[in-house]
Swiss-Prot record:
Record-linked CDD domains: BRCT_DNA_ligase_like, LIGANc
GO function terms (MF aspect): DNA binding; DNA ligase (NAD+) activity; metal ion binding
Keyword Hydrolase set for record: no
Protein's UniProt name: DNA ligase
Domain BRCT, residue spans: 583-660
Lineage: Bacteria, Pseudomonadati, Spirochaetota, Spirochaetia, Spirochaetales
Amino acid sequence: MSSKVQQEIADLKKLIRKWDKEYYVDSLPSVEDFVYDKHILRLQELESKYPEYKTLDSPTLKFGSDLLNDFKEVEHSAPILSLDKVYDLDLLKSWIDKIDFNNSFNISVEPKIDGCSIVLYYKDGVLEKALTRGNGKFGNDVTINVRTIRYIPLFLDEKVDLVLRGEVYITKENFLKINKFLEKPYTNSRNLASGILRRVDSREVANFPLNIFIYDFLNAGLEFKTNDLATARLKKLGFKVNPLIRFFDLKNSIGEVLNYIADIIKKRDSFEYEIDGVVLKVSDFALRERLGYTAHHPKWAMAYKFEALSDFSRVNSIVVQVGRSGKITPVANIDKVFVSGAFITSATLHNQDYIRSIGLNVGDVVKVSRRGDVIPAVEMVINKFSTGFFKVPDNCPACKTAVVKEGAHFFCPNNNCPSVAVERIKYFCSKNCMDIEGFSDKIISFLFEKKFIFSEIDLYTFDFYKLLEFKGFKDRKINNLINSIEASKKKPFSKLLLSMGIKDLGENTIMLLFLNNLNSFSKLFKLCQDRYFAFSTLLKIKGIGEKIALNIIEAFNDSVMLNKFKFFENLEFKMEEVVAIDGENKLLAGKKFCITGTFNGYSRSIVIDKLKNKGAIFNTCVTGSLDFLIVGEKAGSKLKKALSLNIKIMSFEDIKSYLD
């Protein structure tokens, strides 16, 4: 155990030092703060548990450093500390709750600018020097460059000694303009601002529109009791202070503080500058001193950090993928970025029309987001470094069959296409469908490539012990795969029906079928033998349109699909599912719901599952066809949209009885 712990500590220290250099020296970080913080916390945890392995060179005892050899190192007059940070609002509230305000609640809230930290030293009202934060003890002297920033006063009206902290930044608009002309574009405005500030020739720096907000002062050159008075004085002296800083006192509640944070989050995309969080500070300076400091941060301040909603990256290549329906989807392989809590190395480009509309090709710098915090997507071209736009090939990359266009998408029409076949098997085994544990995409692809399986039914006939001759497959693993296959035979009919991959047939439509007495294979098969009668019958079900009705009828007249159903029936799969709706649950049955907010004692997934079991149908977004929106605490934008569409609102109290 000890050697493993020592090795993990050594690996963490090596990795953190690498990231420190990338962030502070190179201005080219490869990971987001969220990831860095997790590794620091893990190292702190290990060093606390095994103090005998904590060394004097540990990153937990030091600060990151932006010191460069190109600039003179100068000692700060006092340690320049970092901020403690949280990524969870509950933890932020907990931090506020722990502060003893002595019946004098006082806190300031301001956006956390995503820029380059700077410390300004004024002597007798004259800017004497400007240092980077450096390692907290020493910083690089960038005075000559800082003097070119027009928003920093070189002389003050009063002969005072001040030490101020500020954040140098560049606006989103100027970032895009400047990045176009750089041989090696920066991935974000923070790195660009940092890079400009560290240019050796100050004449070059003067050509760039750097900006600054002053957010703190570190000495007693001006005597004030509270942060709001100090901020007002700084503004009067000519310093630029963020106008969004807001001060809360006894007249306010913690709820109002959290509401203001929510308002900043909501409006962040409209700001002219990038922010990566908000900063909360105790306003009363006497209380600040009582709360004190750690070696790393003041105890009277806390940063609530956001996970990035989007970021910029370069497109290295574009590939086309073939899905289970044969749909051809172009995908961009990009430089790794961290967005909404996850690393992204690829992003969907939707279809040929979309690529043409944004004019994208390999080599371009693009804006990447995670739509709905799930699917990575390229939103727009930021810098065009290529000519023309990417064109989807005329032939399927897997089977070379000529592709056909249906609407905005290209499709491979070959039902025997190997990519289509393997994607169908992956879908069949997926968590939302048959949920066959152990059958990862990698294992399914391996079985397919070795020609052990060609379709879903082969999973139930293959002798898995043949895998013993391959690396990575031992008795235990093979037995687990076999047990998972056997367990799948007990899944409800709704899961089997979903797993068959009938076009546009999802969980909600299946529930509608079941609620209308079409809850078995035999009933669906019998209905669909008379196509015209089936079509009119299905259209009478609210929520089923012409397209899905035709797809259902086609599927239950397709010989390949029917043979699969017969195969599973012979294996004694469940071919019928009873949906029992009693009088109490009639309100829910077949109705379309959406959910927003939090629910005391219940996760959203539990609420959804319990109501689904009683016949409710859930949508992920608010549309005009919705019957009810279930609203918990801290409801989001869905509530506003639902009200504008006159959709009925249900509270937690309205649904509580259905959750028992």
